[in-house]
Swiss-Prot record:
It comes from Drosophila melanogaster. This is Protein Cep78 homolog. GO terms for cellular component: centriole; centrosome; ciliary basal body; cytoplasm. GO terms for biological process: cilium organization. InterPro entries: Cep78, LRR_dom_sf. Transmembrane segments: none annotated. Residues 561-589 have a biased composition (Basic and acidic residues). Belongs to the CEP78 family. Keywords: Cell projection, Cilium, Cilium biogenesis/degradation, Cytoplasm, Cytoskeleton. It is found in: Cytoplasm, Cytoskeleton, Microtubule organizing center, Centrosome; Cytoplasm, Cytoskeleton, Microtubule organizing center, Centrosome, Centriole; Cytoplasm, Cytoskeleton, Cilium basal body. PANTHER family: CENTROSOMAL PROTEIN OF 78 KDA (PTHR24110:SF3). Signal peptide: none annotated. May play a role in cilium biogenesis.
Amino acid sequence: MSVSRVTMMRKGHSGEVARKPNTVVVSVPPLVKKSSKSRSFHFRYLELCRAKNLTPVPEIRSKSNATTTFLELCGDKLAVSDWQLLTEALHYDLVLQQLVVRLRRTYPQTNIDPIDTEKRARLFRQRPVIYTRFIFNSLVQAIANCVSSNKNLSVLKLEGLPLQDGYIETIAKALADNECLESVSFRKSNIGDKGCEVVCNTAKYLNRIEVFDLSECGLTSKGAEHVADMLKMQKITRFTEGWEKSLRYRSVDVNTIGGLRTVLLADNPEIGDVGIRWITEVLKEDAWIKKIDMEGCGLTDIGANLILDCLELNTAITEFNVRNNEGISKFLQRSIHDRLGCLPEEKQEPEYDLSCVNGLQSLPKNKKVTVSQLLSHTKALEEQLSFERTLRKKAEKLNEKLSHQLMRPDSNHMVQEKAMEGGSQTNISREYVARNDVMPEVIKNSQSYRQSHFNRLVNSAATSPEVTPRSEIVTLRKEQQLQRQQPPPMEVKHLSLEQQIRNLRDVQKKVDLDVEEEEEEEEEEQQAEESQSESEPQNEEQQHYEQQMQVQRKHLQVRKVRSEIKYVENNPKEAAKKNRESKSDHEFANERDFKLNPSVQFETDIGDNVMVNPGHRYEGGGGDTAYVYNYEHEQQQQPVKRGYEHGYVVGVGDGSHRRQRQSQLVEALVQKRVPGASDGHVAQFVSNLERQANAGKTGKKRLKPRPEDDLQVPVGDMHMESSYMSRSEELSSTDVTLENSDYETEATDSTLLSSSKYSSMHVFVRRKQSESMSLTEEAGDGDAGGGGGSGDFGDQNVISPANVYMSLQLQKQREQSA
């Protein structure tokens, strides 16, 4: 058969040539006459075999080549006619995905014999016919055309073929046209350093290539340098792609970027330590290469140390094969394996890709797992699930317990009892304090309370010339009115004073467990003050009473501040006009928080006992004329004033439990007086207080509070004044008590005097050293109305409160006997 006939047969015109041998052949484009089936290698090859009446090669019809996308050819035993049909069918293939052409046997001579004709090729017997130029040239052209045109091709393996000189360049040009290749192998093809350079220059731009096999290709250190250049270019390209994907703060998955993953350079003994140096320098900063095969590459301990240095920086490499390198010691080989964490081959388990299985979101994506890893992961998930179940059960129990506590009706009572038992005095609940506030009212109405209060009268003395002593006990007239208006109350069994003190002691022990040291310090200070004072020491009942009053004292929510002191300049000219005053914390708190004005404060009632506290003093004359104190003279003589001159009222004890009364109470008293009673001592006392408080002062200075000096004046410095009020003076119900005021428990002074059972009251007034005027001149005649008191104070008679009390008791007994 001539060459022209073979050419025509390749182009599909064999039938026309047979029918018209003497006619001129007109070439037609192959796509016009070829069907879709002819573009597949397998269909095209079977058509050609049928046309030539030849039996197909058994290897193509085997199970390995059963699919139309896979082709594996072994060219050792194929004849010339078989190669002609195979090359023609492969030349136009567009379906194959894997193409493998290999020689099973390796021959020492890899050159191509210059046999260019079919006749001479059929007579070639020394080696397989593929080593002839006629067959090998047509095969390379068919492979190159298939690689460049078939975009479905992903695997190309040309193993053991004599790809030398221009043949490898033809394959390399075809590789550049196909960007879908993932695996390229030239194993045992003996391409040399020149062929390696050509292939590497093409493969470094293939972004999808993953496996590049140059094993047994006769490479040297120069070829290793070309491989290093290919790896470097691949690294730069992938870093660029990773940077593009990391824009807008996105995370980059290294596995999603394509490129080389496996480089196989085994059985190239000429590479040596010099070639491995090029490769390790590039791999130090690479993050994509997973496997390097340098088996039998003539490496020594120097190359092994270079590999260890590379592995210290590169953690992406999972396998670095250095077997069959006689120059590397076993210790360094073991070190490389330990650094990689590789398991022995016999202990390695197969890995499975479970990404396609639904319901396994907890497993890492795009990663194969072994059975042992899957079991350990399952065990960890079970432990986590059991822990979550335990937490859920505990939460349900706690929720149920809290709901039961909230539904119980006595839950609030239990909380209050716990607060009363465990809390300190500052942390007592409001209910507990409110219960203690009820106790003073019960105790005040008892006879034992009045008897114990009289013991304090003996050692008491009036310390202020402005305020008279008042008691908080309801008067007899008030009690009679309440009994008339209201039904008889239930009988209350009052405890004795000793039992009440015991109960209060028990409460105080429970509350004051944390303040025992402070109480000891206070007792020492009290003992020191008692030793310095001239008054007689209090008895045991009085000390119990003070403790009782401290417990009964109502706790005001007052913000504690530091004591502020007004300082004045050391100017002798202005020293008489300016005062150095110090205010206590309670005074500042009352002024700022409660807005109390202490400019004019006084008591409104006199109780049915004759108790005089050092913080109280009553001033008034009996009869028509009242005792008037010269306040202007006192202000001129004494630049430093005491606190009681400006209306501070102190109750029983130290006075911290009593409120300060506002000056508006004076106006209320004056407005509620009956017309005819204005000449009484209360009306004159009120008018004197208003005039003296506002005399010579402007708006702000009138209401400016003054601190009080807690000074006690002994009984010897007091003089007595006898006051009397006409029993015929009748007051209205509004004059007797201020029922709409905040002090309903107090009664006016006229309530006591209007009763026929009581006589005149003796009042103690403090004697001042600065008084230059005679008290008798200011008092005038005090016997108006036939009172028992005398207005003559010239003798400065000093009486004892005990005598007053005894006289009152005798008078009371006489009236009862009468």
